Swiss-Prot record:
TM regions (residue ranges): 20-40, 59-79
GO cellular component, one term: membrane
Motif window: Cell attachment site: 106-108
The keyword S-adenosyl-L-methionine appears for this protein: no
Membrane topology label: Multi-pass membrane protein
The UniProt record lists the keyword Hydrolase: no
Name assigned to this protein: Putative transmembrane protein ORF159
Top-level taxon in the UniProt lineage: Viruses
Keywords, alphabetical: Host membrane, Membrane, Transmembrane, Transmembrane helix
The organism of origin for this protein: Acidianus filamentous virus 2 (isolate Italy/Pozzuoli) (AFV-2)
Protein location: Host membrane
Amino acid sequence: MTTPLCYSSPVNTPLSPSLLLLSLLLLLSTICGVLPLSLFCCGIGTGITLFNFDDTSDIIAVDIASAICFIIFCNGFCCCCCSGDPPYASSTTSLAICDGMLSLLRGDPPPVAVTYAPIFIAFCMHNSMSLIESKSGLTAFLTRVTMTSSMLPFSSIIS
């Protein structure tokens, strides 16, 4: 029995977490309609990440932390602005939570890192629900899916 020329055996090549996070965040940015602002916030998050990490050779940790900062800044600036919250309040909260999540990745002992975990979850849920309330139909569904998906990587980090 011959196999067709177009046949290719399935290869198990999972997506890298960073690429998956970036895809989800770009989708979220597109839904919010603030892609330039999100990319700008990503640059800020990357700068903060590199500043906080002592071992710059740990590329994976820096990459993951950059993605975390990306999510936090997108939530802080984009979703809070969409829901009508003061931008300065959202940015301050974002910076505080970003520092807490970076502490988790650096392995700092509690209570510094653990303190921010419930705040971070509540912050993201508040932003997602506020954004969903301001949308309708398919956009609300996509927003709900995207926000829920962006929370999944943190369940293993926080626990």
